């Protein structure tokens, strides 16, 4: 579904935890990471599309999140011709997105990447809000920057945990020493939510190269 100018309506989701860290999903069978996002179907409102995409890509339901804010208007980006399928060239220009900022009120183990039979991600992690954008594909960087900047006004100080700290926080980027394995939260068809070790070679770049397209 395209508008008169050739832009496809879309929603993007910035999901926060209590520490104001953001959810990043690893693209299925790729080394690319991104925020949850997807197209708005005919007849859907942006909010309806957001909740649908949230469940399809993270397994979360409306009761697991709280809407903190959204962008005031559409944020647009044009897609270079080399990334557009030949059959839609001349009609499709890019995407226009409404971005939602959500606060997760459920638990980490409520996240399930196999909520549908067409998963988008095969791993996920929390990262700092101001993730570097130099790894985002160039024509989409401005949209990420605009969304993060506009929605940052809704941020509050991270919630204070009542329980005793369990040790030092994980560093912003995983340390890679030779073939040493790193710990990454992964969800597959047989595990609802678990931590397993993966080879450091699968984490080529942190912050990850981000691909925003569906």
Swiss-Prot record:
It comes from Burkholderia cenocepacia (strain ATCC BAA-245 / DSM 16553 / LMG 16656 / NCTC 13227 / J2315 / CF5610). Signal peptide: none annotated. A motif (Nudix box) lies at residues 38-59. Pfam families: NUDIX. It comes from the Bacteria. Belongs to the Nudix hydrolase family. RppH subfamily. InterPro entries: Nudix_hydrolase, NUDIX_hydrolase-like_dom_sf, NUDIX_hydrolase_CS, NUDIX_hydrolase_dom, RppH. Residues 6-149 form the Nudix hydrolase domain. The keyword Hydrolase applies. This is RNA pyrophosphohydrolase. The keyword Hydrolase applies. CDD domains: NUDIX_Ap4A_hydrolase_plant_like (cd03671). HAMAP family: Nudix_RppH. Keywords: Hydrolase. It is an enzyme of class 3 (hydrolase). Its EC number is 3.6.1.-. SUPFAM superfamilies: Nudix. GO terms for molecular function: pyrophosphatase activity. Accelerates the degradation of transcripts by removing pyrophosphate from the 5'-end of triphosphorylated RNA, leading to a more labile monophosphorylated state that can stimulate subsequent ribonuclease cleavage. Its cofactor is a divalent metal cation.
